[in-house]
Amino acid sequence: AEGNLDVILRSERFAGHDPLKARLVLVDPEALITLPAKVFREGFAEIFKHAAIRDRPMLTDLEALDPTQQRVAPDLIAANLSIKARIVEEDEKETLGTRALLNFGHTIGHAIESTAEYGTLLHGEAISLGIRAALYLSTKKCGLTPEESSRLLRLQEQWQLPLVLDLELSTNDIMTALARDKKFSAGEV
């Protein structure tokens, strides 16, 4: 879950939402069991992302969870929020590059999301697809081992996050959306 109300009000995106700036963040883990399964799973894309970029031991905890139970331990939620807050705190003005870690899967995911017809793809589903693409690129260009990539893909599959785009979208439209992203420069993400 990305933030306090964000898990429930995904359509009400708050410009400039920043967990570090909040005076109080209230989290009710019991509310998760009231969500439709698909919405619960798509919120997991953010938890998965934070574990992948900053807390590999958390991946073991996530592998042990049963997605059908729709329960996440409060300490896991707190640790997840802390990861995001620490990254933002380290690079509040986005000048060091550290904060770019939070974009893992988002650049390509947002391009897919903006190309799809509104309502056909949940935000977390698009991010999951973007993460898969980022894992592929990280294996090819950044030294991520195939074993690490496979582990992360298995976890996405365990949580029933999409790994394959089952919509017919134009590659040209996705590339056009990608080119509009601020993180895309000189033809690279």
What are these regions (language model features)?
Residues 75, 79, 100-103, 107, ...:
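Amphipathic alpha-helical interaction segments
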Residues 1-67:
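A glycine/threonine-rich phosphate-anchoring loop and its flanking beta-alpha core
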